[in-house]
């Protein structure tokens, strides 16, 4: 309930298209239509990453079943391995793939806009102060 909780913006996280480094999409900015011939690898139903992707896809006038093939995987590690091996493309947060030398990035209007991450805390407590202290630590 909004009366019990409050939140603040932690960061805006880039949401990017990912493919193998040698994939023709690597480094490009493309329209959604150019993705439909690809195998799309998505997170499992119920995951936030999948929800974001499906909402943006729907807003662009498309659905998962418009893709050549859809594969659902529950692990970021497995998705990255499949993408790096050239089996398909996916959409993940940039922070999940930035250090992976075998994965390339591409952008798509309407699909790869940044996503807001918020810290939610209980109102009328010291939770905000403690969360800010915790997040300020260089771990």
Task: Cite the ranges covered by each PLM segment.
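Secondary-structure junction motif
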Residues: 40-61, 128
């Amino acid at each position: 309930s909004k009366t019990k909780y409050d939140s603040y913006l932690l960061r805006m996280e880039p949401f990017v298209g990912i493919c193998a480094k040698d994939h023709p999409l690597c480094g490009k900015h493309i329209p959604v239509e150019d993705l439909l011939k690809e195998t799309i690898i998505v997170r499992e139903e119920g995951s936030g990453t999948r929800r974001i992707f499906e909402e943006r896809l729907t807003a662009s006038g498309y659905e998962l079943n418009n893709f050549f093939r859809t594969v659902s995987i529950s692990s970021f590690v497995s998705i990255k391995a499949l993408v790096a091996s050239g089996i398909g493309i996916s959409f993940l947060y940039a922070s999940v793939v930035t250090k992976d030398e075998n994965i390339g990035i591409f952008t798509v209007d309407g699909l790869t806009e940044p996503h807001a991450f918020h810290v939610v805390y209980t109102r009328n407590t010291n939770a905000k102060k403690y969360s800010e202290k915790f997040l300020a630590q260089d771990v």
